[in-house]
């Protein structure tokens, strides 16, 4: 009985994923990094003239505004950038 109870507790902790943190791609999409506390968005920055080639990727707290030369795409799920 104790083994069953202990198993249920362990499964519950694993399923809750305590301390969840966001993971965002770095510039090279194969590599990702865990975002620090407070950085709850992933972003991808690219030049408007070359929209298929990202210049920068990472974690950010607030999505920056686009300009005439630079565009930002932000999202909030793991490796969405």
Swiss-Prot record:
<dbReference type="GO" id="GO:0090729">
    <property type="term" value="F:toxin activity"/>
</dbReference>
<feature type="disulfide bond">
    <location>
        <begin position="75"/>
        <end position="80"/>
    </location>
</feature>
<keyword id="KW-0800">Toxin</keyword>
<dbReference type="InterPro" id="IPR003572">
    <property type="entry name" value="Cytotoxin_Cobra"/>
</dbReference>
<comment type="similarity">
    <text>Belongs to the three-finger toxin family. Short-chain subfamily. Type IA cytotoxin sub-subfamily.</text>
</comment>
<keyword id="KW-0472">Membrane</keyword>
<protein>
    <recommendedName>
        <fullName>Cytotoxin 3d</fullName>
    </recommendedName>
</protein>
<keyword id="KW-0123">Cardiotoxin</keyword>
<keyword id="KW-1015">Disulfide bond</keyword>
<dbReference type="GO" id="GO:0044218">
    <property type="term" value="C:other organism cell membrane"/>
</dbReference>
<feature type="signal peptide">
    <location>
        <begin position="1"/>
        <end position="21"/>
    </location>
</feature>
<comment type="subunit">
    <text>Monomer in solution; Homodimer and oligomer in the presence of negatively charged lipids forming a pore with a size ranging between 20 and 30 Angstroms.</text>
</comment>
<dbReference type="InterPro" id="IPR054131">
    <property type="entry name" value="Toxin_cobra-type"/>
</dbReference>
<dbReference type="InterPro" id="IPR018354">
    <property type="entry name" value="Snake_toxin_con_site"/>
</dbReference>
<keyword id="KW-1052">Target cell membrane</keyword>
<feature type="disulfide bond">
    <location>
        <begin position="35"/>
        <end position="59"/>
    </location>
</feature>
<comment type="function">
    <text>Shows cytolytic activity on many different cells by forming pore in lipid membranes. In vivo, increases heart rate or kills the animal by cardiac arrest. In addition, it binds to heparin with high affinity, interacts with Kv channel-interacting protein 1 (KCNIP1) in a calcium-independent manner, and binds to integrin alpha-V/beta-3 (ITGAV/ITGB3) with moderate affinity.</text>
</comment>
<keyword id="KW-0964">Secreted</keyword>
<keyword id="KW-0204">Cytolysis</keyword>
<dbReference type="GO" id="GO:0005576">
    <property type="term" value="C:extracellular region"/>
</dbReference>
<dbReference type="Pfam" id="PF21947">
    <property type="entry name" value="Toxin_cobra-type"/>
</dbReference>
<dbReference type="GO" id="GO:0016020">
    <property type="term" value="C:membrane"/>
</dbReference>
<keyword id="KW-1053">Target membrane</keyword>
<feature type="disulfide bond">
    <location>
        <begin position="63"/>
        <end position="74"/>
    </location>
</feature>
<dbReference type="GO" id="GO:0031640">
    <property type="term" value="P:killing of cells of another organism"/>
</dbReference>
<feature type="disulfide bond">
    <location>
        <begin position="24"/>
        <end position="42"/>
    </location>
</feature>
<keyword id="KW-0732">Signal</keyword>
<dbReference type="InterPro" id="IPR003571">
    <property type="entry name" value="Snake_3FTx"/>
</dbReference>
<dbReference type="InterPro" id="IPR045860">
    <property type="entry name" value="Snake_toxin-like_sf"/>
</dbReference>
């Amino acid at each position: 009985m104790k083994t069953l109870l202990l198993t249920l507790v362990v499964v519950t902790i694993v399923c809750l994923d305590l301390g969840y943190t966001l993971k965002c791609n770095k510039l090279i999409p194969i590599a990702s990094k865990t975002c620090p506390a407070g950085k709850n968005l992933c972003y991808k920055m690219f030049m408007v003239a070359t929209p298929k080639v990202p210049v920068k990727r990472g974690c950010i707290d607030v999505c920056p505004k686009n300009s005439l030369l630079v565009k930002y795409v932000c999202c909030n799920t793991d490796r969405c950038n």
